[in-house]
């Protein structure tokens, strides 16, 4: 059975992800107590169900300590994938404010004044981060701070399309001026490279457009940067595998996340597609949803 566990911070998009999996044919359960999961998996398998998605959050805090062992045990019999959704505190506060929902851990905190509400919400978010932090190492982390709901649904679809039993590498381009990704395992700064932004004809384009590709591809220093990052990854990917890592997020950052980081993330993703399951995501580039997050397929490989 394929089991997808969705966990992370409240307000980061777990309901959106669960709905996307339901649309993909998964049997979905929200806020299932972790200790019930093995029994549910056995029951559904006996009923002929082959796909299960479960959302688990801090409302199950009394059982969260059991999760690492449960994940290991379930992985012996099932294809288990863990998706850990995260977002910045600022983004989470804005979402709770817009939806007027109360954080699930804020019930015992003061809500008497506006300042008290903000303080209580921040405290609840930080408390939840501490509670669910041990689960992050088992899952692929995705920072949804700047991700729209339709983009997250598309990303979840890409996530479940990956092949099993191998390391999944996500190359994520971003702009430093919008903050660093919360989900990065490795981060490379490519701001030292020539910037197409200063060419007025290239400024409105992205690293996916042919004129920008031609500009960067003609520069030896760009290829040196790509070769160095590629060599580092080729050397250390086996060690990540040996450490039983299932997921690795490699963040590539330039100033705005539109030109250089996009081109380099795409190039590295194509190169590494021979070595691992690869997803590429462009966090800040003004591209459509399908281009901003996709699984690198055979046709992308050089």
Curated annotation (Swiss-Prot):
List, alphabetically, the InterPro entries matched: P-loop_NTPase, RapZ-like, RapZ-like_N, RapZ_C
- Residues where GTP binds: 57-60
Q: Which parts of the sequence bind ATP?
A: 8-15
Q: Which GO terms describe its molecular function?
A: ATP binding; GTP binding
Q: Which SUPFAM superfamilies match?
A: P-loop containing nucleoside triphosphate hydrolases
The record's listing under Pfam families reads: PapZ_C, RapZ-like_N
Q: Which domain of life is it from?
A: Bacteria
Q: State the similarity comment.
A: Belongs to the RapZ-like family.
Entries under NCBIfam families matching the protein: PRK05416.1
Q: What does this protein do?
A: Displays ATPase and GTPase activities.
The identity of this protein, by name, is Nucleotide-binding protein Bcep18194_A6125
Give the species: Burkholderia lata (strain ATCC 17760 / DSM 23089 / LMG 22485 / NCIMB 9086 / R18194 / 383)
């Amino acid at each position: 059975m394929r089991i997808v566990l969705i966990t992370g911070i409240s307000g980061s998009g777990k309901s959106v992800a669960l709905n996307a999996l339901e649309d993909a044919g998964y049997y979905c359960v929200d806020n299932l107590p972790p200790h019930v999961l093995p029994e549910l998996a056995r029951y559904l398998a006996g009923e002929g169900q082959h796909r299960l998605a479960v959302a688990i959050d801090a409302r199950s805090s009394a059982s969260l300590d059991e999760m690492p062992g449960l994940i290991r045990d379930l992985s012996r019999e099932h294809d288990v994938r863990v998706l850990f959704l995260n977002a910045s505190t600022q983004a989470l506060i804005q979402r709770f404010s817009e939806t007027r929902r109360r954080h699930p851990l804020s019930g015992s905190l003061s809500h008497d004044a506006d300042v008290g509400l903000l303080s209580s919400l921040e405290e609840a978010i930080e408390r939840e981060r501490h509670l669910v932090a041990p689960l992050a190492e088992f899952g692929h982390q995705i920072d949804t701070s700047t991700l729209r709901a339709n983009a997250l649904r598309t990303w979840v679809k890409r996530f479940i399309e990956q092949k099993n039993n191998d390391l999944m590498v996500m190359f994520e381009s971003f702009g430093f001026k919008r903050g660093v990704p919360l989900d990065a395992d490795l981060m490379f700064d490519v701001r030292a490279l020539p910037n197409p932004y200063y060419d007025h004809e290239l400024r409105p384009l992205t690293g996916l457009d042919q004129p920008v590709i031609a500009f960067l591809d003609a520069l030896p220093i760009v290829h040196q940067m790509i070769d160095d990052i590629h060599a580092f990854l080729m050397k250390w990917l086996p060690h990540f595998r040996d450490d039983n890592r299932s997921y690795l997020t490699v963040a590539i950052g330039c100033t705005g996340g539109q030109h250089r980081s996009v081109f380099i993330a795409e190039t590295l993703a194509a190169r590494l597609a021979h070595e691992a399951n690869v997803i590429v995501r462009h966090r800040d580039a003004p591209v459509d949803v399908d281009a901003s997050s996709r699984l690198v397929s055979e046709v992308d490989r050089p």
